């Protein structure tokens, strides 16, 4: 992984950062690369309440905020920005609202790399709305000044439609911390982390690949095809 001037990560929910890009985050923060994480909601409408349940619909908001702060501390993120949008409603925000928020962050931080979801290939409506807003915000920047957009994709049909990933970050050395960050999101991954650890120790191919390598697609802005 090359050094970056500043890395901006934009995801909609607490745990997206730990589930999708924890190793990549650690690779940057442990080299003291400036990194900002913009989390648009606190995932308060999530269905998971812990296993066994310890959260309620009323308490989940505060619990997930604490989990997010714990996880980002583990990942070495010093600049966490919680934007306070309502979970599961991002697709219904006023047109241009999310784009403007992201534009302001880009103008302030001048990142060389932005990481978010690949719009249309990230399964959840909030994921797709976030990725679309990031793409729209970055598209307003002239190509020679635009940061690279690393997009995360995992819809069932994604490789058939957008091809194999352009980048696969090798993050084996960060697996223990990656699992620790996931464990911090206890309301969402209480039993999953135990299962992942067991599968990793047993050498389950899919789990080893998921924990040790993080794939990204470089988002294709239309002006690149001119």
From Swiss-Prot:
SUPFAM superfamilies: LmbE-like. InterPro entries: BshB2, GlcNAc_PI_deacetylase-related, LmbE-like_dom_sf. GO terms for molecular function: hydrolase activity, acting on carbon-nitrogen (but not peptide) bonds, in linear amides; metal ion binding. The keyword Metal-binding applies. Pfam families: PIG-L. It catalyses: (S)-malyl N-acetyl-alpha-D-glucosaminide + H2O = (S)-malyl alpha-D-glucosaminide + acetate. It is an enzyme of class 3 (hydrolase). Its cofactor is Zn(2+). Its EC number is 3.5.1.-. Zn(2+) binds at residues 13, 16, 127. Keywords: Hydrolase, Metal-binding, Zinc. Belongs to the PIGL family. Involved in bacillithiol (BSH) biosynthesis. Catalyzes the second step of the pathway, the deacetylation of N-acetylglucosaminylmalate (GlcNAc-Mal) to glucosamine malate (GlcN-Mal). Could also be involved in bacillithiol-detoxifying pathways through formation of S-mercapturic adducts. This is Probable N-acetyl-alpha-D-glucosaminyl L-malate deacetylase 2. It comes from Bacillus anthracis. The gene is bshB2.
């Amino acid at each position: 992984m090359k050094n970056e001037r500043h890395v901006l990560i934009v995801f909609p929910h607490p745990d997206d950062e730990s589930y999708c890009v924890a190793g990549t985050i650690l690779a940057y923060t442990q080299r003291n690369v400036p990194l900002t994480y913009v989390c648009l909601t606190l995932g308060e409408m999530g269905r998971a309440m812990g296993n066994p349940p310890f959260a309620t619909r009323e308490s989940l908001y505060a619990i997930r905020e604490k989990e997010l702060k714990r996880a980002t501390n583990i990942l070495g993120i010093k600049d966490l920005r919680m934007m306070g949008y309502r979970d599961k409603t991002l697709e219904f925000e006023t047109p241009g609202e999310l784009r403007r928020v992201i534009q302001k962050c880009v103008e302030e931080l001048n990142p060389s790399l932005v990481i978010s979801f690949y719009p249309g290939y990230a399964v959840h409506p909030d994921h797709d709305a976030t990725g679309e807003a990031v793409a729209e915000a970055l598209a307003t920047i002239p190509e020679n000044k635009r940061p690279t957009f690393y997009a995360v994709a995992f819809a069932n049909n994604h490789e058939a439609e957008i091809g194999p990933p352009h980048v696969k970050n090798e993050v084996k050395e960060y697996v223990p911390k990656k699992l620790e960050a996931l464990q911090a999101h206890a309301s969402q991954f209480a039993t999953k982390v135990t299962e992942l650890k067991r599968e990793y120790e047993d050498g389950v191919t899919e789990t080893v690949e998921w924990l040790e390598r993080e794939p990204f697609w470089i988002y294709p802005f239309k002006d690149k095809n001119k």
